[in-house]
From Swiss-Prot:
Belongs to the methylmalonyl-CoA epimerase family. It is an enzyme of class 5 (isomerase). Transmembrane segments: none annotated. Pfam families: Glyoxalase_4. It comes from Pyrococcus horikoshii (strain ATCC 700860 / DSM 12428 / JCM 9974 / NBRC 100139 / OT-3). NCBIfam families: metmalonyl_epim. This is Methylmalonyl-CoA epimerase. The keyword Transport does not apply. Gene3D superfamilies: 2,3-Dihydroxybiphenyl 1,2-Dioxygenase, domain 1. It comes from the Archaea. Keywords: Cobalt, Isomerase, Metal-binding. Signal peptide: none annotated. GO terms for biological process: L-methylmalonyl-CoA metabolic process.
């Protein structure tokens, strides 16, 4: 079964220092709408709205967080691409049936209370892809 994505939800950008990153992005003319800590993911998130899309600046809150490990290995930069979907559970099941390598077989709670799940980059041409279901 082929399913449609709703749209790009956000681009996640890993940063070493959230305050410094906010100054840079605000200097470009963007406005941070909210800052939130997601303890379960060991990350602090600054949300910049760009039309219907978002940029999320991601700062690690612990040395063992996925963002800290990413920065240590690759440096600051684009961490993931998030796609807005409906019924994330069925999307994950479909991808699993098709043989995609899933980091999350079941959704978890992300920033803003969204249901999220990641697909492994080895299954998606080297891109960490996040599926994201939000209440409209």
């Amino acid at each position: 079964m082929i399913w449609m994505f709703k749209r790009i939800d956000h681009v996640g950008i890993a940063v070493k220092n959230l305050e410094e990153a906010i100054k840079i992005w605000e200097g470009l003319g963007f406005k941070v709408e909210e800052i939130e800590e997601v303890p379960d993911q060991k990350v602090k998130v600054a949300v910049i709205k760009v039309g219907e899309n978002r940029i999320e600046l991601l700062e690690a809150t612990t040395e063992d967080s996925p963002i800290a490990k990413f920065i240590e290995k690759r440096g600051e930069g684009i961490h993931h691409l998030a796609i807005r979907v409906e019924n994330i559970e069925s999307k994950l099941e479909e991808l699993k049936q098709k043989g995609y390598k899933l980091i999350d077989e079941k959704p978890r709670v992300g920033a803003g209370g969204a249901k999220i799940a990641f697909i492994h980059p080895k299954s998606v041409t080297g891109v960490l892809l996040e599926l994201c279901e939000r209440k409209e």
